[in-house]
């Protein structure tokens, strides 16, 4: 199982809590062992207007869980009239992962969203869950953490968070052969979910 897990772990995802929202970022490369098999993969997935997850690992397992979480979030809203909270989504995902730990989903998730305030959780392959101000997952996580640990500070603006997330991903791309081929950045604020276009990202980085 460990060899299989190693084979599917390539990527780098980053999550950062800012004073006005959450930033999720990920590279776009998909690899299988030493082979690059896709260069424009979406690794950040919208669950609803105020919830999203970033997944590092096996694409099939990640998409299967994304479909399940979207359905659960819609069901929760239809039954209660309320949106599922970030903590509830992360806990649900952790319970699913833990329930499958003997035949695990080969994935590690960052769960970000906005309730009364921005929140970020990390959920590992066997259902361990941690609330963080910043987190990273995937084969480039050691390199990304070197940037986040030294440069993160409380009360970052959304623009500062975007710049830090991109810097962390770019550092991983330079050192990790399993990460690369561009960066996707998503923000989640009280106004909702937004995926930055290439031009919007470029403009933010120039500020």
From Swiss-Prot:
Q: Which residues form the active site?
A: 11 (nucleophile)
EC number per UniProt? 3.4.25.1
Task: Give the family this protein belongs to, as stated in its UniProt record.
Answer: Belongs to the peptidase T1B family.
The gene that this protein is the product of is psmB2
User: What organism is listed for this UniProt entry?
Assistant: Pyrococcus horikoshii (strain ATCC 700860 / DSM 12428 / JCM 9974 / NBRC 100139 / OT-3)
| UniProt-listed CDD domains | proteasome_beta_archeal (cd03764)
Q: What's the protein here called?
A: Proteasome subunit beta 2
Q: What is the lineage of its organism?
A: Archaea, Methanobacteriati, Methanobacteriota, Thermococci, Thermococcales
| Keywords assigned | Autocatalytic cleavage, Cytoplasm, Hydrolase, Protease, Proteasome, Threonine protease, Zymogen
Task: Look up the coiled coil feature and give its residue ranges.
Answer: none
Q: Which GO terms describe its molecular function?
A: threonine-type endopeptidase activity
Which InterPro entries is this protein grouped with? Ntn_hydrolases_N, Pept_T1A_Psome_bsu_arc, Pept_T1A_subB, Proteasome_bsu_CS, Proteasome_sua/b, Proteasome_suB-type
Cellular component per GO? cytoplasm; proteasome core complex, beta-subunit complex
Query: Where, subcellularly, is it found?
Result: Cytoplasm
